[in-house]
Design a protein with these regions (language model features):
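Low-complexity, Pro/Ser/Thr- and charge-rich linker/hinge segments at domain boundaries
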Residues: 101-121, 126, 130-131
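Immunoglobulin-like IPT/TIG beta-sandwich domains and homologous Ig-like subdomains
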Residues: 31-81, 86-90
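Sec-dependent N-terminal signal peptides
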Residues: 3-13
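Beta-strand/beta-sandwich contexts
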Residues: 16-45, 103
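Substrate-binding/active-site clefts of carbohydrate-active enzymes
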Residues: 128-173, 177-297
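Edge beta-strands of extracellular beta-sandwich domains
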Residues: 93-102
């Protein structure tokens, strides 16, 4: 019996392991003091959550027991590391995560883009290859293939940084890059609009620090950067699409439905409900799951 109890306890610990936390960190002094933290792990909703040093307002559970949504109030939060602990029904600590609240850096006050700006739209994979060592990555399916018209050609963040003199000489004041977050589509991933991780720069473009370095280089020149970040849909290779928190997390039909792209329907008082639904809830392409923006989480 004692041996079985030990096995049972070990299985509890194994089941409760935190696999992901998003966002992975946050900042003090944000204008919006509310923060929602997603915790993901096998059957993690079965456990109680306690937080030391952070004001945990409530914990929301969903259909899928692999998720917990933690709502915090950071009105008076200071930078530092704070424990998020999981406890079982016997009040035994099962797992722990040290969550970081960073200090906001006092950067230069740079105004938003306006009619005086010359904006240059860059598709990074097609612009310049500054680091050939990251053209392919073992974690991602599609590899570099310059012979393929729709394949990856190797452009990256380093290529943009190395050409800032050229862009500035052209009179460019603002760079708008197409999305740079990870896209693990097996084909045509160079456009990066089917994001599979919205907290990670695609390794074939560089790292999160490389993106930060690009922004710093631009700001030192008095230039601006526009971040293209997709919130309408995710790629079907995104880990959450493979294990949905709720059935209504994405838009679904009895069979696959593509958006009709008829934007005028949205403001047309005579448009049919069917056409409006297809416009708003239809998918761009089969590899891009349309997110349900009506879901409160």
């Amino acid at each position: 019996m004692r041996y079985l109890s030990i096995l049972f306890f070990v299985s509890l610990i194994t089941n409760a392991q935190i696999k992901r936390i998003e966002p992975p960190f946050w900042w003090e002094g944000m204008n919006d003091s509310k923060l929602q933290v997603l915790i993901y792990g096998d059957n993690i909703a079965r456990y109680k959550v306690k937080s030391k040093g952070m004001d945990l307002i409530n914990v929301e559970r969903v259909e899928n027991e692999n998720y917990l949504f933690l709502n915090f109030n950071l009105s008076f939060q200071k930078k530092g590391f704070y424990d998020i602990d999981l406890y079982d029904s016997f009040d035994r600590k099962i797992d722990n995560y040290s969550y970081e609240i960073k200090s906001r850096e006092k950067g230069k006050k740079i105004s938003s883009f306006n009619s005086s700006d010359v904006i240059y739209l860059i598709m990074p994979d097609r612009f310049a290859n500054g680091n050939q060592s990251n053209d392919s990555h073992p974690d991602l399916t599609e590899k570099v293939n310059r012979k393929e018209q729709d394949g990856r050609h190797g452009g990256d963040i380093e290529g943009i940084i190395k050409n800032l003199d050229y862009l500035q000489e052209l009179g460019i004041t603002t760079i708008w890059s197409t999305p740079l977050c990870e896209d693990n589509d097996p084909k045509v991933s160079y456009h990066t609009y089917a994001q599979s991780d919205v907290y990670r720069i695609d390794p074939r473009f560089g790292t999160n620090n490389d993106y930060k370095r690009l922004a710093e280089n631009l700001h030192q020149r008095g230039m601006k950067i526009i971040m293209d970040y997709v919130t309408n849909h995710w790629g079907i290779e995104h880990w959450m699409i493979k294990d949905l928190p709720n059935k209504d997390w994405i838009h679904k039909f009895d069979k696959y439905v593509n958006t009709n792209h008829r934007k005028e329907i949205h403001s047309d008082p005579y448009a049919s409900k069917k056409d409006k639904k297809e416009l708003i809830q239809g998918w761009f392409v089969p590899s891009m799951a349309d997110l349900n923006q009506s879901n409160p989480l």
